């Protein structure tokens, strides 16, 4: 119990980390929008993430692959930042997609942008304490968004499906997969979709209480199609942590209204503290 408490205390996400995440998101959105999957702009976004992740001291890998889409074969890029500490320990995997929804004019500041910046900031925090925690992997996935109106077997989640194969090929023993999505909303309310691991959902709520944010995380009655589904289908324990109430009636989602002005440093702080608390519990 004492070791777990020390781990939770060491992985602290503070106001300066929230400010860093907010700044990183703004720079990412301003520099790399649009960043639709399978496009040149998407490749530019991947390079931007690679550069920032490489500065954290992680073992960084770029995974370029091709996958079928409704528009034919397309080139996708996943990024992995690994913090290995103990070869016998299991891994906790944090996931964020970075691509934008095609043909919508959506800048993806919250949807794809906010958690891209958050993961980079979390990488800095994890790097500082890497000798005191278990194995952590951060994954930025391409191709989460579908090109059409609805997801289909060859439209959407190409990046998360590829990440599953990466974990299998590398024989990573995984404790949990936490998929982060749309967590910069100034009016932050984090939901856990019903089609996720029930134990991880309870851990998320417990972690929220431990950081003094009892009502921050709420279970959903409905299932949501997000990156966590690919990991669940492969037998991994996974959940999505998502704010699916972005604007009145979720009106800003996948629209030109998804801008950095809708985001809040305080929301980054809450989300970052929640994730670090969950890492402290899981590791």
Where are these regions (language model features)?
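Hydrophobic alpha-helical targeting segments used for export or membrane insertion
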Residues: 3-12
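N-terminal capping segment at the start of a domain
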Residues: 11-44, 56, 99-100, 180, ...
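A non-catalytic alpha/beta surface segment that caps or lines the substrate-entry region
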Residues: 23-84
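Sec-exported extracytoplasmic/periplasmic mature domains
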Residues: 26-34, 50, 54-58, 121-131, ...
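Active-site-adjacent substrate-binding region
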Residues: 34-37, 62, 176, 185-283
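Structural recognition of the beta-strand scaffold that forms the well-ordered cores
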Residues: 62, 80, 91-95, 137-140, ...
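Acidic/histidine-rich catalytic neighborhood of metal-dependent amide-processing enzymes
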Residues: 75, 102-207, 211, 215, ...
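Proline/glycine-enriched tight loop/beta-turn segments at coil->beta junctions
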Residues: 85-91
